[in-house]
């Protein structure tokens, strides 16, 4: 029986937001005001589609975007964590559920040779079209009013766990490692033995702290981390038996 590790990507695996990082490829490293102002809450993926079109129209090519994305720094201790997981892969399944896109995540994992760590990546599908423009689509449609229109991470997590159960894979625990507001919804799926691991000082940690103070029911335990090394320590504790 294995433990399921669920990772967010932006500000969790990498120490920045890949979507805002790519703006450095724009002329003068900024977007025009009318494009910036076109964002509507809950519709980030559509907004990024317009950003990618703007970059393409300005002549920004795939190799330039790839160079920018692969220069994104890993969060402190994350490389050590992935090496630890690789050595203990018989004890863990790992998935990514991210609001980024498949092209950016592929580039980062490939450049660092970490593809083998992850059994599945759930994110907004992206590809370069015949004009050389990066296009991105919503991962799915859902009815959750807590999450952005393109992705409810809780729905994805439930579907993955159910599918694994149908194939005879039952996890002893789920450990959810994230940072953002859109990680709150999947954390509410966690049960008794599961662990929510919010990054210290980020929205997820602040929200879980507020929920705890309000005495909202939380079956799972909460372990805060600042570095991947903190996560290693807790995983070592979980597998020591």
UniProtKB/Swiss-Prot annotation:
It is an enzyme of class 3 (hydrolase). Its cofactor is Mg(2+). Keywords: Hydrolase, Magnesium, Metal-binding, Pyridoxal phosphate. The active site is at residues 8, 10. Signal peptide: none annotated. CDD domains: HAD_Pase (cd16418). It comes from the Eukaryota. Pfam families: Put_Phosphatase (PF06888). Mg(2+) binds at residues 8, 10, 179. Substrate binds at residues 19, 99. The keyword Magnesium applies. It catalyses: pyridoxal 5'-phosphate + H2O = pyridoxal + phosphate. One of its GO terms (molecular function) is phosphatase activity. Its EC number is 3.1.3.74. Phosphatase that has high activity toward pyridoxal 5'-phosphate (PLP). Also active at much lower level toward pyrophosphate, phosphoethanolamine (PEA), phosphocholine (PCho), phospho-l-tyrosine, fructose-6-phosphate, p-nitrophenyl phosphate, and h-glycerophosphate. Belongs to the HAD-like hydrolase superfamily. PHOSPHO family. This is Pyridoxal phosphate phosphatase PHOSPHO2. The gene is PHOSPHO2.
């Amino acid at each position: 029986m294995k433990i399921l590790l669920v990772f967010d990507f932006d500000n969790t695996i990498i120490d920045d937001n890949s979507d805002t990082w790519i703006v450095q490829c724009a002329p003068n490293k900024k977007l025009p005001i009318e494009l910036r102002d076109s964002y509507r809450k809950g519709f980030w993926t559509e907004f990024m589609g317009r950003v990618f079109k703007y970059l393409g129209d300005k002549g920004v090519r795939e190799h330039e975007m790839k160079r920018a994305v692969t220069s994104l720094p890993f969060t402190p201790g994350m490389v050590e964590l992935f090496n630890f997981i690789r050595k203990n892969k018989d004890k863990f399944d790992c998935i990514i559920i991210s609001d980024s896109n498949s092209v950016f995540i592929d580039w980062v994992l490939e450049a660092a040779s970490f593809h083998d760590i992850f059994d599945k990546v759930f994110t907004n599908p992206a590809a370069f079209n015949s004009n050389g423009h990066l296009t991105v689509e919503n991962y799915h449609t859902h009815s959750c009013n807590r999450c952005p229109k393109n992705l409810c991470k809780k729905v994805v997590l439930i579907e993955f766990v159910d599918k694994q159960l149908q194939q005879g894979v039952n996890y002893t625990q789920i450990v959810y490692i994230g940072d953002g507001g859109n990680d709150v919804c999947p954390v509410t799926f966690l049960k008794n033995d599961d662990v929510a691991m919010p990054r210290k000082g980020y929205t997820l940690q602040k929200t879980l702290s507020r929920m705890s103070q309000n005495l909202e029911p939380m079956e799972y335990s909460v372990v805060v981390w600042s570095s991947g090394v903190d996560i290693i320590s807790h995983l070592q504790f979980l597998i020591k038996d």
